[in-house]
């Protein structure tokens, strides 16, 4: 069985790990961080993968970060923003002691240059949406944003690393084009070497804040999970990021950490895994069929068999730590009701609904999810429905998603800032909808092409109120989306990392990024304790 196969593999991995041991003394004080996947661009106006954003968080700075209580902590800003009574003018005082990596002074003109560039050429329209109307320089170190409308999520937006400032001098020839292979920002590290598989970071001596606790970082990408796992086991790397490895190896590392053989760190659960259904073409244009497919998934079984429970079942699009995320409106596994809906649409009793399910072939958890779900459908609904699996490399999936190429596809999403807006808008916003079909907008780009009457108004309303009224609107949005059944949330993932005992346990910020500047080696005496 699938469970037996996974368990056997995990046992072999655990044995190999135990026999080889975790600790190899390092002769360098530099720290090596390993992950999978390549970085094709460093341009904040284009970067969207977790891997790339993690790097940006080390070489760039946001205007603000979030404290543990959710309040804003000024970073490049000098203090909290001032917002006008109508909510449409936002004034941001900036620090006066910041320089870019090329020595250029950071000021309001530089920040305005970067924001205007992002608004002009950025491919990540969901980050800002239609909120910012104009960017103005009010004083040498005072920036003013004119908004099209009041925005409750603006504070979260101002923490986005995608809006990190760039040196106007370094990007003078790239005001209207992307710069993929270099980055000149204000962060605690400067980039001294870049290719898709390796990046070398050196501490920035003129950094305005606390200096890094290490003399430099080497970020490397290895080709597969086994290579990454082996590199940590042999001591070739100091830190390993969890998104890079197979579930059985992740489980093995989790068990090793419990025994004290290495450090494990867990960040905030902000990444959602979900399935998108193509809603604008037959047969899945039939809402009852989409609802039946949603009812056929047993999340609890998937969580346990695929991830040993490390990925928690999720029945919402909004992570539970955010406003409106404390509910679970999506229905639980119910094959009996699924069969009723399938029969109403003419299936069962000799007629099967064939659903092509695409998984990203280079994402290990995707294939295990697909196989587990396929087995569930075969067990519960064999006479009514069958899943046909197809593995496609992730870059191809992302490129073809907005073309309507996939009837059903497994994806994941990490909001660019911790606010419900950063999860709902990228999946649901639509600039041109006809009934329940989105012709143009993020819902089309995300591959569902689904909308609903009243949904776009509700999305805007949710970003104009706070507290209980906002939660009520967010709940309405989720209810509409549940009924439409174009998205099926599957699980919630916390970022994890493992480090040698020679490195202090890694820490995460509230946005889910590893604090790379906090990585620090410990003395041999501390290591032995």
Where are these regions (language model features)?
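Gly/Pro-rich hinge or "lid" segments in bacterial periplasmic/extracellular proteins
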Residues: 159-212, 216, 226, 336, ...
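Extracellular/periplasmic solute-recognition and catalytic clefts
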Residues: 134-136, 192-200, 218-281, 304
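Aromatic- and charge-enriched surface segment that lines or borders ligand/interaction sites
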Residues: 79-123, 138, 144-146, 231, ...
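N-terminal lobe/hinge region of extracytoplasmic solute-binding protein
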Residues: 35-85, 116, 184-185
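Surface-exposed binding/hinge segments that line
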Residues: 93, 127-171, 193
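Ligand/substrate-recognition segments at binding pockets and active sites
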Residues: 345-415, 495
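Extracytoplasmic/peripheral linker and loop segments enriched in polar/acidic and small residues
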Residues: 23, 81, 383-402, 425-501, ...
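Structural transition elements
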Residues: 312-345, 361-368
């Amino acid at each position: 069985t699938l469970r037996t196969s996974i368990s056997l593999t995990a046992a072999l991995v655990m044995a190999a790990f135990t026999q080889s041991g975790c600790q190899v003394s390092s002769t360098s004080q530099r720290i090596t961080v390993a992950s999978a996947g390549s970085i094709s661009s460093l341009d904040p106006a284009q970067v969207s993968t977790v891997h790339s954003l993690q790097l940006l968080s080390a070489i760039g700075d946001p205007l603000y970060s979030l404290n543990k209580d959710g309040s804003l902590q000024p970073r490049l800003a000098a203090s909290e923003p001032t917002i006008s009574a109508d909510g449409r003018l936002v004034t941001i005082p900036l620090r006066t002691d910041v320089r870019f990596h090329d020595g250029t002074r950071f000021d309001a003109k530089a920040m305005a240059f970067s924001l205007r560039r992002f608004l002009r050429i950025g491919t990540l329209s969901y980050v800002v949406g239609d909120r910012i109307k104009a960017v103005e320089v009010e004083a040498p170190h005072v920036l003013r944003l004119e908004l099209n409308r009041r925005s409750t999520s603006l504070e979260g937006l101002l923490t986005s690393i995608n809006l990190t400032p760039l040196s106007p001098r370094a990007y003078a020839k790239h005001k209207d084009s992307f710069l993929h292979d270099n980055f000149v920002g204000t962060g605690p590290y400067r980039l001294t070497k870049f290719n898709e598989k390796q990046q070398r970071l050196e501490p920035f001596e003129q950094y305005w804040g606390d200096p890094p606790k290490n003399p430099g970082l080497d970020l490397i990408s290895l080709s597969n999970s086994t290579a990454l796992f082996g590199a940590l086991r042999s001591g070739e790397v100091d830190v390993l990021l969890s998104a890079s490895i197979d579930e059985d190896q992740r489980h093995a590392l989790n068990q090793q950490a419990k025994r004290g053989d290495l450090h494990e760190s867990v960040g905030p659960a902000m990444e959602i895994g979900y399935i998108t259904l193509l809603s604008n073409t037959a047969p899945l244009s039939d809402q009852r069929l989409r609802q039946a497919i949603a009812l056929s998934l047993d999340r609890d079984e998937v969580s346990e068999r695929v991830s040993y429970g490390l990925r928690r079942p999720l029945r919402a699009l909004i992570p539970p730590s955010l406003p409106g995320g404390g509910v679970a409106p999506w229905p639980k596994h119910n094959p009996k009701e699924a069969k009723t809906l399938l029969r109403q649409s003419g299936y069962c009793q000799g007629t099967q609904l064939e659903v092509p399910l695409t998984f990203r072939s280079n994402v290990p958890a995707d294939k295990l999810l697909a196989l587990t779900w396929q087995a569930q459908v075969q067990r519960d609904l064999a006479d009514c429905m069958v899943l046909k699996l197809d593995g496609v490399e992730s870059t191809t999936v992302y490129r073809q998603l907005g073309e309507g190429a996939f009837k059903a596809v497994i994806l994941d999403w990490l909001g660019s800032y911790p606010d419900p807006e950063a999860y709902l808008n990228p999946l649901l916003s639509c600039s041109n909808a006809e009934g329940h079909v989105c012709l143009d907008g993020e819902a089309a780009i995300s591959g569902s092409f689904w909308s609903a009457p009243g949904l776009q108004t509700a999305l805007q309303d949710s970003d104009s109120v706070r507290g209980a009224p906002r939660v009520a609107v967010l709940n309405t949005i989720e209810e509409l989306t549940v009924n439409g059944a174009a998205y099926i949330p599957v699980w919630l993932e916390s970022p994890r990392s493992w480090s040698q005992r020679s490195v202090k346990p890694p820490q995460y910020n509230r946005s889910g990024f590893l604090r790379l500047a906090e990585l620090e080696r410990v003395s041999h005496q501390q290591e032995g304790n």
